[in-house]
A protein has these predicted regions:
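Short amphipathic alpha-helical "recognition" segments used for binding
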Residues: 6-7, 24, 116-118
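C-terminal motif of bacterial Sec signal peptides marking the signal peptidase cleavage site
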Residues: 18-23
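Mature, Sec-exported extracytoplasmic domains of Gram-positive
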Residues: 28-310
Length: 310
C-alpha cells in the first residue's frame, strides 16, 4: 500500500500550484477556475462546500446534510443542517452561508437533545411505575400480578419459590434499566452545545485495475456527532403481569461518540447545475457555488503529492 499523508506543507504546495497556474494565464480560484480544478487544489483554498445525498439532484428543494468550510490550511469545519435546502443559499455570501450553517448546527443539537429527553422521560415514568408495583407485591408477599387471578394458596411450595425467583430477577433487571435511563437522561440534560472546530482532513485515492488512474477519491475528517441516550417503549402503559413474562417492551440506545470520523467518496465530477441565481459545481454529494463560466473540477491523479493511494 502506497500512502502519503496530507500535511500542511502539501496544502501549501497545492496553494502555490494554484497561484502559479493563475499567473500563467489561467484562473484557478475555487469560484472562477478557467481550467478544471483538482480536489486537492480546491480544498486547499478557503471555500464553502455543501454536502447532500449523492443520489439526489441539486435542486431548489434538495436538502443539505452538511456545510463544510475549508480554511485553506488543511482543515475543514463541518456543520450539520436541519432541513436547509439549496434554495436557502440563494443570495447569500460565503460568510452568510457560514453564519446560517452555525445556526443550523445548533438547531440540530437542540432538536436531537430535546427528542431524546422527550422520549426517555415517559419511559422512565413507566418503568418506575411497574417497578414500584412489583416491588410492593414482592415485599408484601401478595404477588398479585404474577398470580394472574389465581389464589396464592393454590401454589405449591415449589411454585411459590419459582414465583419469588421470577420477581427477584425482574426487579433486578428493572432497577438496572431504571438506573441506566436516569443516568442517560441526566447526561442529556447537562449536555451543552459546543460550536464545531476546524479539523485536519485527509484525501485518499482508489485506483482502477491498472493502478495508474484514479477511480475515486475520498475526503475524511472528524465531525461532531450529536447522539444522546434515548429510551423508547412500545407502549407507555406497561402491564406488570406481562413484564414478569416478557420484560419491558421497548429499546434504548446509548449516547454515541461526540466526534466521529466521516468520509465522503467523490467520483466523476457532475455537470454544473443552476438553482435560482446560483451555479453549483462539484461532485455527486458535494458541491460549491461557482461562476457561470467555471471550468469545473476533477479528481486528483495518483501521483499527486500529499494524498494516500490505495
Amino acid at each position: 500500500m502506497k500512502k502519503r499523508r496530507l500535511t500542511a506543507a502539501a496544502v501549501a504546495t497545492a496553494c502555490l500550484l494554484t497561484l502559479t497556474l493563475a499567473g500563467c494565464g489561467g484562473t484557478n480560484d475555487v469560484k472562477s477556475a478557467s481550467e478544471p480544478l483538482a480536489v486537492s487544489q480546491a480544498f486547499g483554498q478557503e471555500s464553502v462546500w455543501v454536502q447532500y445525498n449523492e443520489n439526489d439532484a441539486i435542486e431548489k428543494d434538495g436538502e443539505i446534510d452538511r456545510i463544510l468550510v475549508f480554511d485553506g490550511n488543511g482543515n475543514v469545519t463541518a456543520y450539520q443542517c436541519d432541513g436547509a435546502t439549496f434554495a436557502d443559499l440563494n443570495g447569500k455570501s460565503d460568510d452568510e452561508i457560514v453564519e446560517m450553517a452555525k445556526e443550523q448546527d445548533k438547531e440540530v443539537f437542540d432538536a436531537k437533545r430535546q427528542d431524546a429527553l422527550d422520549s426517555t422521560a415517559p419511559a422512565i415514568d413507566s418503568i418506575q411505575s411497574v417497578y414500584d408495583t412489583l416491588k410492593d407485591e414482592y415485599d408484601s408477599g401478595t404477588y398479585t400480578s404474577g398470580l394472574r387471578g389465581s389464589a396464592l394458596s393454590d401454589l405449591t411450595d415449589a411454585d411459590l419459590e419459582q414465583l419469588k425467583s421470577i420477581y427477584s430477577q425482574v426487579l433486578t433487571d428493572l432497577e438496572a434499566q431504571l438506573n441506566a435511563a436516569k443516568d442517560g437522561q441526566a447526561a442529556t440534560e447537562s449536555a451543552t452545545y459546543q460550536e464545531p472546530q476546524a479539523q485536519p482532513y485527509t484525501l485518499h485515492i482508489e485506483t482502477d485495475s491498472t493502478g495508474n488512474n484514479t477511480q475515486s477519491e475520498t475526503i475524511s475528517f472528524d465531525a461532531p456527532s450529536y447522539s444522546f441516550y434515548k429510551a423508547q417503549l412500545d407502549d407507555e402503559e406497561q402491564n406488570p403481569a406481562d413484564v414478569l413474562t416478557w420484560g419491558i417492551k421497548g429499546s434504548s440506545t446509548e449516547a454515541g461518540d461526540a466526534i466521529r470520523n466521516e468520509s465522503i467518496e467523490l467520483f466523476s465530477p457532475v455537470n454544473k447545475q443552476t438553482v435560482y441565481d446560483m451555479t453549483f459545481a462539484g461532485f455527486s454529494g458535494l458541491a460549491t457555488i461557482v461562476n457561470e463560466d467555471h471550468a469545473g473540477f476533477m479528481l486528483d491523479t495518483p501521483d499527486t503529492e500529499g494524498i494516500e493511494v490505495d
